[in-house]
Regions:
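Catalytic cores of the polymerase beta-like nucleotidyltransferase superfamily
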Residues: 1-343
Length: 343
């Protein structure tokens, strides 16, 4: 329900579904939750996940009904499940991601039993459908507190089950809290959310999978294929490997590949392509990515500074900078071989 610029989410009361107590399994043995069964408010409260998420507001009487001490837990800044957390997480493992999201966004303290259970039950995330996990990851990383949320995913052992291959490729350049690629990208995204600026999910996912794609591409180098062919082949392989866990929609992955490809072109700085790159629809995202890589020590600061400077220049100075590149490029030697005469 929209009220001015605010959005209030409304849900129906759900009752107990005696005919479908357990989630059914899809073809890939992933959990498919049963359809909603309408019920009374007293039934609905027992189906909620956390106490702070089980408050009922009457907009006419302006009264909040609290059956499970949710208001008290909010005041104590404590997150508790309704009932046994093991049972709640078994019913729907996505609740573990929701716990991390609430903790990060609202600065809550997790119940001690819940904290112990998260690492033990993290593996049950593999039973959740890949498209649903993609949506839940977006909610954790795009709510304005993604940096803290990512740390919590890592701390509780959830991250390795969301990105099993990518996490094995993470190194100091990726995870360093001061200038690592991922923490800096998440802090920048958090700031954009705070400033009410748009954020795009392809950017963060391109950062998260970059190291794996980069290393896979390097392993393919040296053959007959171009650097761009190797990149596309590696990107396809990485995304395909991730599919059973987290399924990134094609509309997202296509943008990710564009951002990765532009990293190569920005590093090459070929004079004939500079103006075309500056007008590329993904240039800004690729440029921001390049700045993060420079901060992490992956590319030189001078390269990042050059691309920063050329964007601020008038057209005549842009041409001068491009000419400077042409003059600095080593000239190819003309072939001295004589052309063969055909008889």
């Amino acid at each position: 329900v929209r009220i001015g610029r605010d959005v209030i989410e409304v849900s129906t009361y759900r009752g107990s579904d005696t005919g479908h107590q357990e989630p059914r399994r899809g073809r890939a043995k992933k959990k498919i939750l049963p359809n909603n069964v309408f019920g009374r408010r007293e039934e609905d409260v027992l189906r909620r996940d956390f106490t702070i998420n089980a408050l009922y507001y009457d907009p006419v009487k302006e009264v909040v009904t609290d059956y499970v001490d949710g208001l008290g837990h909010i005041q104590e800044r404590r997150l508790e499940t309704i009932g046994d957390p093991r049972e709640r997480f078994s019913e729907d493992p996505v609740r573990m991601l929701r716990a991390v999201r609430f903790k990060a966004k609202l600065n809550l303290r997790l119940d001690a039993k819940m904290e112990k259970l998260l690492p033990r039950m993290a593996g049950t995330l593999t039973t959740v459908s890949p498209p649903r996990l993609f949506e839940e990851i977006i909610k954790v990383l795009h709510n304005g507190h993604g940096a803290v949320g990512f740390q919590a995913l890592d701390r509780y052992g959830l991250l390795q089950f969301l990105f099993p291959s990518a996490t094995r490729h993470f190194g100091e350049q990726d995870l360093n809290k001061t200038n690592g690629l991922i923490p800096c990208a998440l802090r920048n995204t958090d700031q954009r959310v705070a400033d009410r600026k748009p954020v795009i999910s392809p950017f963060l996912f391109s950062v998260l999978l970059w190291r794996q794609v980069q290393q896979a591409s390097r392993m393919k180098s040296g053959g007959n294929r171009s650097i761009f062919e190797n990149l596309h082949s590696s990107a396809d392989g990485v995304l395909q490997e991730l599919h059973p866990t987290v399924r990134i929609p094609r509309r997202i992955s296509a943008v990710m590949i564009e951002i990765w490809e532009l990293q190569i072109r920005l590093e090459q700085r070929r004079p004939r392509t500079i103006k075309r790159l500056l007008s590329h629809r993904r240039f800004r995202a690729a440029y921001d990515f390049l700045l993060l890589r420079a901060g992490a020590g992956e590319v030189s600061d001078s390269l990042a500074d050059w691309w920063t400077e050329i964007q601020e220049m008038p057209p005549t100075d842009v041409q001068r900078m491009i000419q400077g590149l042409e003059q600095s490029k080593p000239q190819r030697k003309k072939s001295t071989r004589r052309k063969r005469k055909h008889t």
